[in-house]
């Protein structure tokens, strides 16, 4: 438990300074900005979208670049970014960041290819685990629909993670951050619904509506206002910590009756350790693989104990439900 809590607070402290890197040392340099202005003036249309005819031979976009809608201004920014990186390296300075991000080599038009690939791995991991859940758990089991809802929310979140890392713009960023939080919020919702699975449908419907209303309100807030990275990070951490705390307390209470409680503890311990990757901040290896991409890779594997827990729990809840129906009202 200490590992998870410590990781939450360490990342929370780290996030408090996150907004300071929105403008980074690379894009603040006069070298980069002069390069960008000259490039756009010489090569781009007035709106910055089209590459002028005389510059086409210098900016030969692939079909993937065009598919991802890389504009002339984007190409200038990309080229000037690498010229600035070379200038820093020639002076033996540290690799700079640009607009809060490390420089990445584009591949097939993808802005952060490793994060795209690992986000896809996460999506497939949820699909695979959901199929396993459906094979091993009967539809009439308690909490069956809740875990389906969790999978749907998670799959949607990873779809937008793929989109965002493929092409970073204000819209894809908003959707990625929003739906990533929906997945964190969903873990808290699943915990609450699991604790209340024997209560009336009216109470559960009211709580479900409260969760939905809260998420919609949060989405509207970060959409119409100025997006705050520190607020988003803190909100994720607090929500995740509440979920982890709830499961830890539940595990302590049922540790003798439900030996599979270790799986949910294992999930949160692994999650807490994986979050430490977000604290590592180094230039991308081969200009592709950075700490954030490694974090996405790590989360691919830690979903297995969570789904395994859900399978064991739903099956045992169904058995208990059967015994209750025949008059044996006792938890196994």
Regions flagged by a language model, labelled:
Residues 19-332:
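Multi-pass alpha-helical transmembrane bundles in non-GPCR membrane proteins
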Residues 2-5, 10-29:
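N-terminal signal peptide
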């Amino acid at each position: 438990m200490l590992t998870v809590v410590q990781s939450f607070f360490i990342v929370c402290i780290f996030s408090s300074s996150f907004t300071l890197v929105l403008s980074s040392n690379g894009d603040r340099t006069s070298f980069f900005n002069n390069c960008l202005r000259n490039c756009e003036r010489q090569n781009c249309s007035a709106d910055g979208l089209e590459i002028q005819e005389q510059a086409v031979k210098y900016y030969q976009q692939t079909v993937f670049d065009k598919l991802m809608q890389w504009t002339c201004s984007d190409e200038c920014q990309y080229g000037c970014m690498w010229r600035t990186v070379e200038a820093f390296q020639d002076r033996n300075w540290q690799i700079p960041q640009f607009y809060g991000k490390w420089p990445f080599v584009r591949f097939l038009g993808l802005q952060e290819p490793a994060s795209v690939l690992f986000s896809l791995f996460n999506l497939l991991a949820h699909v695979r685990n959901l199929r396993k859940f459906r094979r091993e758990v009967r539809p009439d089991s308690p909490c069956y629909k809740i875990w389906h809802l969790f999978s749907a929310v998670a799959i949607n979140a990873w779809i937008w993670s793929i989109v965002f890392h493929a092409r970073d713009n204000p819209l894809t960023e908003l959707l990625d951050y929003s739906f990533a939080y929906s997945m964190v919020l969903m873990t808290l919702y699943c915990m609450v619904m699991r604790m209340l699975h024997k209560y009336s449908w009216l109470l559960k419907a009211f709580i479900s509506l409260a969760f939905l209303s809260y998420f919609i309100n949060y989405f509207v807030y970060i959409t119409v206002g100025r997006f705050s990275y520190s607020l988003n990070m803190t909100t994720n951490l607090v929500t995740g910590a509440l979920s982890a705390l709830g499961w830890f307390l539940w595990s302590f209470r049922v540790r003798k009756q439900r030996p599979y409680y270790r799986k949910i503890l294992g999930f949160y311990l692994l999650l807490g350790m994986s979050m430490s990757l977000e604290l590592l901040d180094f230039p991308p290896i081969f200009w592709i693989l950075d700490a954030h991409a490694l974090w996405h890779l790590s989360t691919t594997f830690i979903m297995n104990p969570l789904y395994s827990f859900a399978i064991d729990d739903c099956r045992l809840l169904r058995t208990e439900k059967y015994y209750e129906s025949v008059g044996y009202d006792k938890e196994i």
